Amino acid sequence: MSLWNACPSRNPSCSSSFPWFLAVRVMDLPFRSPLHGGLLRPGPVLPRSRGPVVLRSKRDVEVRHRKRDREILSLAWPAVLGASIDPVLSLLDTYWVSRCLGMVALAALGPALNVEDWMFDILKTVQVPVRSLTSEAVAAKKPQDVLQTLTQALCFCWRVGLVVALMGSVLAPLLLRLSSVEASSPLLEPAKAYLVPRLWGSPGLLTLIVLQATLSGAFRDTTAVLRLVLLGAFLNAVLTPLAVVGMHGGTAGAAWATTVSCYASAVCAWIMVARRPGGPWLPQPRKLFATAFLGKEVEGESKGWGKLLAANAAMTLRSFSSLTTWLVACSIITKIGVAPLAAHTCMTKTFLSFLYWMYGFQLASQVLVSADVAKGLPRRARWTALRAMRMAMLVASATALALWVGRESIAAALVRDPLVIQSFETLVPPAMAMLLIYGAMWVAEGVLYGLGDYAWAAKCTSFAASAAILVMLLLSRVQPTAPHIWWSLNVLMSIRAIFGLHRAFFSKRSPLSSKAAMASEITQ
């Protein structure tokens, strides 16, 4: 209420004892009056006590932190469950093939799965840039950019998937030969029968990967991704025994069951994304097919190809470097002996099962950081990433402790040979250290992906892989043990973690560094 409006003639509820002759409007004073200099301008209203204000601000900060923690966990836990289902699915084909087709067919799955995992792990890297690009577009309220990104990504995946299917079918014997399956080996035919149908599922798998990345990135709906994974697992569980036992399809039947499940999940994912409000998010299937295979251009499809291809090339290089390091480690341990190799295989499976519990925090940090940076909130992105890292480190510590406490039970459940059990227990300390390193490294890499720094992540991983391979090759000359090789792998992880943390939080080029975040807040 202004001083003029406080007059009793205008406001009867006011006290009549006030000296209203002083209630003079500023506009009625002469121009040169000092009151025009701002003496009657309202100043800031200060609270009588700063205690409640401080408490209220602390309470608000705690509320914001709890809200962001819930957001991180809501993204992380469905992703963790979805990633944990994959190892179980990989055992499904193994179970039915071993039960119904015999040891030769079971042994043939080994090299076929090696080739399949190698190729698909590299191809699936397209999901990382798609997740960041769609998250940034939605945060910036540019749905047309989401449509453009998905058009480009789906065209790329369909083209690459078709090439992989055709070339893989022709070159399957050569690919299996790289896994030590010779032309005269009895493993060749069942391995080829399994590999070729799986490669024909490449277009469907890549489509599913891109749409899942869109659901988790643009819409932050990892629960929908989990439902898709469960759908694929259910279909695979039903179709695999039907194809192997009912139709006597052999290893090819098991592969076709997985491929059909993948295509069905891709169709459901397409429907989920297309029905999201605020679209259109997806191009029409006919136009997309014409663009991918007939060369007809869709509006917006020709723009921004360089960014997507560069990001995918960088992620491919990163995955190739990491997989090559593990391949070299496996080859060196193979020369050490059978028991260390069996222990290495069991520890790798166990380690990956524990590692998937931290994958969700990498995804959450990537999605939330990319959205906050797109909104111009680098300081919020910084403490979001730090809180995600704290959660990941807690999970990493818990999994490392669980591995140490349950090492004997895990070894006894996997193998019965006392030599293998003894070798397995010697690998527990380096595996625990690797879990702790991953707790920080994966979140740091998720931040870098959210910032779009794919090229630097690829360079860092390539450098670290070269260093780790060099250490392992030097150790191979002095009769190393399997724990020596695993500690050498920790060289790779440590380099990636240290340089990744510096790049994400301390580099001058990072918007999440403390100085850059403060400068951005002051500018705003």
Question: How does the language model describe each region?
Answer:
Residues D28, L39-A76, T134-G204, V238, ...:
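Short alpha-helical transmembrane segments in multi-pass integral membrane proteins
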Residues V80, S84-A107, L176-S185, L242-G249, ...:
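Helix-terminus/linker motif at the lipid-water interface of multi-pass membrane proteins
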Residues M1-V45:
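N-terminal chloroplast transit peptides
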Residues E71-S84, D93, P129, G300-I332, ...:
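Core transmembrane alpha-helical segments of multi-pass membrane transporters/permeases
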Residues L81, I85, L89, M119-L123, ...:
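Residue-level hotspots within pore-lining transmembrane alpha-helices
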Residues K124-V128, P197-G217, L228-A233, A254-W270, ...:
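Short runs within selected transmembrane alpha-helices of multi-pass transporters and secretion channels
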Residues L91, V210-T214, A237-L242, W270, ...:
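Alpha-helical transmembrane segments of multipass membrane proteins
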Residues L106-L166, L208-R220, A224-V225, L341-R407, ...:
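Small-residue-rich hydrophobic transmembrane alpha-helices
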